Amino acid sequence: MAVSESQLKKMMSKYKYRDLTVRQTVNVIAMYKDLKPVLDSYVFNDGSSRELVNLTGTIPVRYRGNIYNIPICLWLLDTYPYNPPICFVKPTSSMTIKTGKHVDANGKIYLPYLHDWKHPRSELLELIQIMIVIFGEEPPVFSRPTVSASYPPYTATGPPNTSYMPGMPSGISAYPSGYPPNPSGYPGCPYPPAGPYPATTSSQYPSQPPVTTVGPSRDGTISEDTIRASLISAVSDKLRWRMKEEMDGAQAELNALKRTEEDLKKGHQKLEEMVTRLDQEVAEVDKNIELLKKKDEELSSALEKMENQSENNDIDEVIIPTAPLYKQILNLYAEENAIEDTIFYLGEALRRGVIDLDVFLKHVRLLSRKQFQLRALMQKARKTAGLSDLY
């Protein structure tokens, strides 16, 4: 039964970056259906334990034209994705771990991708895809060979083969100090049935030429040549492994430096574009400032000129009609309004007792007669000009 996103959030309730971890986990289980999230207790080297979520199941690996289901278990720390997952190969009872530069005798997986893990560049889905590619070149497990009971047990003619676990470069830890590598008592993880795995062949291991001095002497002691050859072989293997580790680390660091260089080049280009754009904007602003100053000077000059002209100009000469008929209408209208004002002030003078009633009536009759004539003449002029009636 598929695990829903809400169930994952409940399982990862104590994770510091729960939503981000859930999102990456959902992407993984959507692509690799055999991987299932399980909440279990993880025991560290110091004996402490912690409830963590692991992805357990199989991933499809193509090896020599066939697809094999490789069982793995990925433990997600509660600080994921800022710390890498702890990865293991978990063989079934019919499988045996093949130790190498990427897998040790306990099944723990070592990859340069894990060593150089850095969020957000590194993520879980990409890690699994890298595992598939690497396991396709060097399978981490193989089928356990069956030994027929009819054959007598094989007696080695030389010293037993020494297995060397892949080590990390000195001074470098693949994981933070708060999360030490998993002890041999790592909790087991159930897996779905897996397909057949490639059986071991002599081509998987380097053949050793026969040496006449190999094996114990007749008196039961091991010869010095045998010990020396064994030590030389062990040291050579260890030196090759260390050299490979150093080369992988240097290549990873070189790739990181190249990415940093590309980012710096892109940033430099963006900064140059920003500086160019700012220079253009500054030039445009300076141009607008000069234009505004010029217009301000023109307005100030025009205003000063108009003020000087207003002091010397007659108000009657300022307004000049476009035609003689319009000038006549303007004069008639002004004169008629002047008579209207005169009659008003005569009434005020009568009210205040400044003039007598006879004087008032005499002047009002004269002004009213003239006003009537002005209005009649103005009406005629407006009609001639095609204007509407005013009264």
Curated annotation (Swiss-Prot):
PROSITE patterns per the UniProt record, alphabetical: SB, UEV
CC annotations in GO: centrosome; cytoplasm; cytosol; early endosome membrane; ESCRT I complex; extracellular exosome; Flemming body; late endosome membrane
Predominant location category: cytoplasm
Subcellular location: Cytoplasm; Early endosome membrane; Late endosome membrane; Cytoplasm, Cytoskeleton, Microtubule organizing center, Centrosome
One of the record's GO molecular function terms: protein homodimerization activity
GO biological process, one term: exosomal secretion
Annotated TM spans: none
Polar residues: compositionally biased ranges: 200-215
Record bears the keyword Protein transport: yes
Sequence positions bearing Phosphothreonine: T221
Domain SB: 323-391
PTM comment, free text: Monoubiquitinated at multiple sites by LRSAM1 and by MGRN1. Ubiquitination inactivates it, possibly by regulating its shuttling between an active membrane-bound protein and an inactive soluble form. Ubiquitination by MGRN1 requires the presence of UBE2D1.
Membrane topology designation: Peripheral membrane protein
Disordered as annotated region, ranges: 197-220
Domain UEV span(s) in chain numbering: 2-145
Residue positions, PTM N-acetylalanine: A2
One of the Pfam families matching this protein, by short name: Vps23_core
Domain notes: The UEV domain is required for the interaction of the complex with ubiquitin. The coiled coil domain may interact with stathmin.
Family from the record: Belongs to the ubiquitin-conjugating enzyme family. UEV subfamily.
Subunit description: Component of the ESCRT-I complex (endosomal sorting complex required for transport I) which consists of TSG101, VPS28, a VPS37 protein (VPS37A to -D) and MVB12A or MVB12B in a 1:1:1:1 stoichiometry. Interacts with VPS37A, VPS37B and VPS37C. Component of an ESCRT-I complex (endosomal sorting complex required for transport I) which consists of TSG101, VPS28, VPS37A and UBAP1 in a 1:1:1:1 stoichiometry. Interacts with DMAP1. Interacts with GMCL. Interacts with ubiquitin, stathmin and AATF. Interacts with HGS; the interaction mediates the association with the ESCRT-0 complex.
Biological role: Component of the ESCRT-I complex, a regulator of vesicular trafficking process. Binds to ubiquitinated cargo proteins and is required for the sorting of endocytic ubiquitinated cargos into multivesicular bodies (MVBs). Mediates the association between the ESCRT-0 and ESCRT-I complex. Required for completion of cytokinesis; the function requires CEP55. May be involved in cell growth and differentiation. Acts as a negative growth regulator. Required for the exosomal release of SDCBP, CD63 and syndecan.
PANTHER family: TUMOR SUSCEPTIBILITY GENE 101 PROTEIN, TUMOR SUSCEPTIBILITY GENE 101 PROTEIN-RELATED
Protein name: Tumor susceptibility gene 101 protein
Gene name as annotated: Tsg101
